[in-house]
């Protein structure tokens, strides 16, 4: 059922949540950069030089401070301080600093600072500069007997412009640009506290819990408060079989509060889950049996307060665990949150003006989810994963354009949210090949068939996705890397015709995403590495979203310091 929700002011609103099948989703093989894991959390190390976060279902770091590490690789020894600084040809600075140290024998500290921005506008378009800043601090202690505590705070500031207007085709005055293509800022302040037992011995009760708080607000008055609580209990015992493979019973509990407003009226939502389970494993199998009960306050009358979904998964290992067959049935609901939506699409319409509505956020509901596939490691050289996914989802979200009339013309550069019921089938493949000790190839492919009930297409969701990353160590000092990202089969719902009192809408196929980057690192010594990156080599002006092209080719250069 496609859904048009109604806001508090009796205006029509389209709304969306989010689910995207991902090739690198659960229990993936070693296909992403690994860092050594100390007893405390590392700050985020991702730096993305693009003008807005394009969340491919196959994400890769364009600039990575750490290299790839396979199962047999020797991990890089962590340093207390890592700093990366560079500049792109579009006045695009990138900066990353992370610190990790043990303040005492039982107290660890992690600090992270990140900045990336671009200050030159895209030719012919409205102002398109952007800036992303982040800061976080984490502490972890194991001072207390049998318990580990961790906590931290963070701050994020993201600035974008609603630049999706071609001024060569639709000239605007400075006043009109300020009104229809304004600057937008999103600020997020948050913190977390975690507790976990350090002992998991047979016959003992283990537990873990996390408390999270997040406050997000934008320039135009939209605000969201979020509180999340997760707590898990587990008891392990040898009720039968091999003493080296005990069984486990457990209970996972969750509670969330989300309060969002774009006006003076606050929309409060509450979500909870209860998930009892039983686990057992042996040399050749693993089995997880559970059931999930969740409840959420409803905005749409058709939505139920309570829902029960399966939580079942298992694996079968053969050939001395070189080959794994896995399958699972899952489901459940997830709150669609303002902070998560604008992180994916920062061009959401949040400014409340006369004759305009604002977005409503519901709960995405996976009524049934199946996943299955095989994983294998061939001769310690090739990691291969083949899988299939199926999702039957209610309140599945899509982005749709909003429009403004300007001097008998139409501007479409902000997005609202639309829900529909969907059935999605995905075929996935991941492979990682390591030849000798110098050449590594990572390949990924996904075919997605998403069928909405009422919408003509699954707006902005790609049918085909692919990735390729090659890393080659020429010698002890010089290394090269190449990344190719591809997406095809994306459609946008756009304005097709209009009169004095109505707008017509129709589908348009977007240009395929083809993004190739070439990079190199030169190790001056153990502390200093110089890097260069040529991004979007083919100078493709593909669109992140309709009317939002990327900048094209750009050259980055800088240094990485470890000390």
Give the positions of each predicted feature.
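N-terminal periplasmic/intermembrane-space "pro-region" immediately following the signal or transit peptide
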Residues: 7-73
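Short loop/turn motifs that connect adjacent beta-strands in outer-membrane beta-barrel proteins
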Residues: 71-78, 103-106, 142-149, 198-206, ...
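Exposed, low-structure sequence patches enriched in small/polar residues
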Residues: 78, 83-86, 114, 284-563
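Membrane-embedded beta-strands of outer-membrane beta-barrel proteins
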Residues: 97, 135-137, 191-195, 229-233, ...
């Amino acid at each position: 059922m496609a859904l048009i929700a109604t806001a508090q002011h009796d205006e029509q609103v389209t709304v969306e949540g989010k689910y995207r099948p991902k090739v690198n989703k659960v229990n993936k093989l070693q296909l992403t950069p690994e860092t050594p894991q100390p007893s405390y959390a590392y700050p985020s190390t991702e730096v993305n030089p693009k003008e807005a976060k394009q969340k491919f279902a196959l994400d890769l770091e364009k600039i990575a401070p750490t290299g790839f590490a396979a199962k047999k690789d020797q991990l890089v020894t962590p340093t207390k301080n890592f700093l990366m600084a560079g500049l792109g040809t579009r006045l695009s600075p990138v900066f990353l600093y992370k610190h990790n140290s043990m303040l005492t024998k039982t107290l660890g500290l992690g600090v992270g600072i990140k900045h990336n921005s671009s200050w030159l506008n895209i030719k012919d378009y409205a102002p398109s500069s952007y800036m992303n800043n982040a800061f976080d601090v984490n502490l972890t202690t194991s001072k207390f007997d049998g318990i580990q505590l961790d906590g931290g705070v963070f701050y994020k500031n993201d600035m974008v412009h609603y630049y999706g207007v071609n001024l060569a085709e639709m000239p605007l005055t400075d006043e009109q640009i300020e009104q229809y293509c304004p600057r937008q800022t999103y600020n997020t302040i948050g913190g977390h506290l975690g507790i976990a037992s350090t002992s998991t011995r047979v016959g003992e009760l283990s537990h873990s819990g996390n408390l999270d708080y997040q406050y997000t607000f934008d320039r135009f008055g939209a605000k969201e408060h979020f509180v999340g609580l997760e707590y898990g209990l587990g008891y392990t015992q040898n009720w039968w079989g091999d003493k080296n493979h005990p069984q486990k019973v457990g209970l996972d509990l969750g509670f969330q509060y989300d309060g969002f407003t774009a006006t003076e009226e606050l929309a409060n939502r509450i979500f909870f889950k209860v998930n009892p389970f039983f686990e057992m494993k042996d040399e050749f199998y693993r089995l997880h049996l559970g059931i999930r009960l969740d409840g959420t306050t409803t905005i749409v009358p058709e939505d139920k307060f309570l829902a029960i979904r399966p939580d079942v998964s298992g694996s079968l290992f053969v050939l001395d665990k070189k080959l794994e067959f896995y399958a699972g049935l899952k489901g459940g609901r997830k709150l669609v949150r303002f902070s998560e939506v604008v992180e994916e699409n920062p061009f959401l319409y949040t400014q409340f003006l006369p004759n305009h509505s604002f977005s409503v956020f519901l709960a995405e509901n996976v009524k049934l989810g199946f996943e299955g596939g095989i994983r294998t490691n061939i001769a310690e050289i090739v990691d291969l994963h083949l899988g299939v996914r199926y999702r039957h989802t209610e309140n599945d979200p899509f982005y749709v354009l909003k429009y403004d009339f300007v001097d008998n013309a139409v501007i479409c550069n902000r997005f609202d949210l639309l829900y529909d019921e969907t059935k999605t089938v995905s075929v996935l493949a991941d492979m990682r090949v390591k030849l000798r000790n110098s050449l590594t190839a990572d390949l990924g492919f996904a075919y997605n068939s998403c069928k909405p009930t009422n919408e003509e297409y699954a707006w902005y969701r790609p049918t085909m996705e692919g990735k390729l990353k090659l890393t080659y160590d020429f010698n002890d000092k010089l290394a090269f890397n190449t990344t190719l990202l591809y997406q095809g089969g994306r459609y946008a719902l756009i304005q097709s015709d209009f009169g004095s009192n109505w707008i017509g809408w129709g589908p348009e196929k977007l240009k395929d995403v083809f993004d190739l980057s070439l990079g190199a690192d030169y190790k001056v010594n153990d502390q200093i590495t110089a890097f260069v990156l040529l991004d979007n080599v083919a100078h493709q002006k593909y669109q992140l979203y309709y009317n939002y092209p990327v900048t094209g080719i750009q050259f980055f250069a800088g240094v990485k310091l470890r000390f």
